[in-house]
């Protein structure tokens, strides 16, 4: 099992990172909280989780061990696959997710693409006990992570990132269009667009 990879960021295309590890390029899908911290040429350590299916093997990467643990915990919930787990971690910060579960906030969870009311309620029931220990180590701040990202096309990058979460192209375009005038960085546009869609 590959527990973590240390290497240089070779290419970025939301939400996938191509990581050069001693001359071998690993394609790793990441939540936006991790993706938006990365820059081409940067040396990084990504905590990884490998999913093996009949038709493919896919690596998922995270900036820290806690986020990886949360991802694995989400996968244990009936009906939650890697794509949905990644979408949850991309839309909600670890702190907000823990806060949401602690306070039975179904309305926040259903704003994540692909999460309906039944899935949200199942997440609440199955994660409540598992998240009690996490709640002690995190604040309940309802903010998305502070992220920095360098891109030649901030608007296009933001739209692509939102679509990778499961938002429809028109939804992503509208959300980005509503906030793009106020920001110049992709990460800021993504964060503001996500916040606007969570209202």
UniProtKB/Swiss-Prot annotation:
Cysteine disulfide links: none
GO biological process: DNA recombination; DNA repair
Signal peptide: none
Keyword Iron-sulfur included in the entry's annotation: no
Quaternary assembly: Homotetramer. Forms an RuvA(8)-RuvB(12)-Holliday junction (HJ) complex. HJ DNA is sandwiched between 2 RuvA tetramers; dsDNA enters through RuvA and exits via RuvB. An RuvB hexamer assembles on each DNA strand where it exits the tetramer. Each RuvB hexamer is contacted by two RuvA subunits (via domain III) on 2 adjacent RuvB subunits; this complex drives branch migration. In the full resolvosome a probable DNA-RuvA(4)-RuvB(12)-RuvC(2) complex forms which resolves the HJ.
Domain of life: Bacteria
Flexible linker, as annotated region: 143-150
Transport in keyword set: no
Gene Ontology terms, MF aspect: ATP binding; four-way junction DNA binding; four-way junction helicase activity
Protein name: Holliday junction branch migration complex subunit RuvA
Record-linked SMART domains: HhH1 (SM00278)
Function statement: The RuvA-RuvB-RuvC complex processes Holliday junction (HJ) DNA during genetic recombination and DNA repair, while the RuvA-RuvB complex plays an important role in the rescue of blocked DNA replication forks via replication fork reversal (RFR). RuvA specifically binds to HJ cruciform DNA, conferring on it an open structure. The RuvB hexamer acts as an ATP-dependent pump, pulling dsDNA into and through the RuvAB complex. HJ branch migration allows RuvC to scan DNA until it finds its consensus sequence, where it cleaves and resolves the cruciform DNA.
Membrane spanning stretches: none
GO cellular component entries: cytoplasm; Holliday junction helicase complex; Holliday junction resolvase complex
Compartment(s) of residence: Cytoplasm
InterPro entries per UniProt: DNA_helicase_Holl-junc_RuvA_I, Hlx-hairpin-Hlx_DNA-bd_motif, NA-bd_OB-fold, RuvA, RuvA_2-like, RuvA_C, RuvA_C_sf
Keywords: Cytoplasm, DNA damage, DNA recombination, DNA repair, DNA-binding
